[in-house]
Amino acid sequence: MVASRLAAGGLLLLALLALALDGKPAPPQPLRKAPAGGTTAWRRELTEQPEGASRPAAGGGGGGGRSGSKAANAAPTAPKSKGGAAAAAAAAARLMRDLRPDSKQARAAWGRMVHPEHHAGGGGGGGGGGGASRRLKGVAKKGLGKGCFGLKLDRIGSMSGLGC
């Protein structure tokens, strides 16, 4: 009953949408051709700036530090000298690297989104993880080794579901 009313409402909305458009399809958009130079041409296209962007940004904070967000750091600045062109190319390369969907960081972020319960683990250095990922020393290390079946107690209950 509810499904039929929902379907009828959807059809009514589609009919009203068709009347609002007067049956005219949208004009076709011309296809944009890819540059012949591949990724090099894309980088060149990214470094080209419109006329309005050639002025320096307000605030004067143009240092080379990495304290801002990635989007602020990736924005190409106007070249001031011959070295400025290299800086603009580096900014464009950084933008391309950040937008790449198959990078290591993107895969790690996707894994954390899909499996949030496994994020507390964590491997080597570089932070992240939480308190469970630090190595135990001294007495705590000796007590941890003799668990169920000679395996670590924290692994048995959490991952396999065996428990002791």
Swiss-Prot record:
Compositional bias ranges of the Low complexity kind: 68-93
Disulphide linkage map: 148-164
Summary of the tissues where the protein is detected: Expressed by the venom gland.
Residue ranges, compositional bias (Gly residues): 58-67, 121-132
Signal peptide, first to last residue: 1-23
Keywords, in A-Z order: Cleavage on pair of basic residues, Disulfide bond, Hypotensive agent, Secreted, Signal, Toxin, Vasoactive, Vasodilator
Keyword RNA-binding: no
UniProt GO MF annotations: hormone activity; toxin activity
UniProt key word Metal-binding: no
Renumbered residue ranges of the record's region Disordered: 24-93, 115-134
Positions of the propeptide removed during maturation: 24-142
GO annotation (BP), single: vasodilation
Gene Ontology CC terms: extracellular region
Family label: Belongs to the natriuretic peptide family.
Protein name: C-type natriuretic peptide
Species: Philodryas olfersii
